[in-house]
Design a protein with these regions (language model features):
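Glycine-rich phosphate-binding active-site loops on the catalytic face of alpha/beta enzymes
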Residues: 56, 111-118, 166-181, 228-245, ...
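C-terminal alpha-helical cap/extension of soluble enzyme domains
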Residues: 4-16, 197-268
């Protein structure tokens, strides 16, 4: 029996088997709004085994004087740091995308997000930025609109997702923002199933990270696709909560604890 600080590891339940890190499915991607190293250490102390990608949100990396200490912590816990897409968008708009990417590489980021929700950018220009970034990073390409009340029809999402992957993105990320009320969701935070199914049918569930900041949204995706669905924009305080949802240790998803119910029926 393995003990951690005097407490034995719990191993008495039959639960879905989760792959160990580094994994390619069942990813938990968290959104860091600008916490310091001490807060990051608290999250990692409890949940590093359940955290795969740590997005340093928006442009916070540019002004965070403790960024180096935080990125070192992430590396020590085998969590990949991701540069938020807004910073790269602004750099691109100023003609400084190469400088931004060079800085991100030197800082220690392993992932970068490529988005087009802040500045005007055509799909052709986005593909070019993805190709540029993919030379040195794993690219998360965001699809969908950030604008409240603006809903792209379901038929438009697969076209951008396929284009982004063809340009070299490792994964596509469906827009949901920190609020969970845009993009893949309506203004009340309800999932738009037609959008989800259109994207998954086009590129497969394993190549999509679904931004899902709300517990009800996370539970919906796990019930639909099983515990190995990739979830993004998870709050730092919700890392363990999401893992319990994956394992069926919350009433919202208790059925996934039965192996015959965990696989889902989605395209691979």
């Amino acid at each position: 029996m393995i003990y951690h600080r005097g407490v034995p590891d719990a191993s008495f339940l039959d639960l879905p088997q989760r792959p160990a890190k580094p994994r390619t499915t069942g990813l938990t991607h968290v959104l860091d709004p600008g916490v310091g190293p001490a807060a990051a250490a608290d999250v990692l102390g409890a949940g590093a085994a359940h955290t795969d990608i740590w997005k340093v949100g928006w442009g916070t990396a540019y002004v965070d004087r403790a960024l180096g200490a935080k990125l070192a912590l992430l590396a020590d816990h085998a969590v990949s740091a991701c540069l938020g897409g807004t910073l790269l968008e602004i750099a691109w708009a100023q003609g400084r995308a190469r400088e931004c990417l060079a800085w991100a590489g030197e800082a220690g980021f392993g992932h970068v997000e490529v988005s087009r929700g802040t500045v005007e950018m055509t799909l052709r220009e986005k593909r070019g930025l993805i190709r540029l970034a993919a030379a040195d990073f794993a690219v998360l390409a965001e699809v969908g609109s950030k604008a409240p009340g603006e809903q792209f029809a379901a038929r438009h999402w697969p076209l951008e997702a396929i284009s982004d992957l063809d340009a070299g993105a490792s994964l596509v990320v469906t827009e949901g923002r920190q609020s969970g009320t845009v993009g893949t969701f309506d203004a009340a935070g309800r999932v738009r199933p037609d959008v989800v199914e259109a994207v998954v049918t086009a590129v497969g569930r394993k190549r999509v990270v679904f931004e899902a900041p709300q517990t009800s949204q996370q539970a919906w995706f796990i019930r639909r696709f099983g515990p190995e669905v990739n979830l993004g924009n998870v709050a730092l305080s919700d890392v363990l909560s999401v893992e319990t949802l994956r394992l069926g240790l919350r009433s919202d998803t208790a059925a996934v604890a039965r192996p015959e119910d965990a696989a889902g029926s989605e395209p691979a």
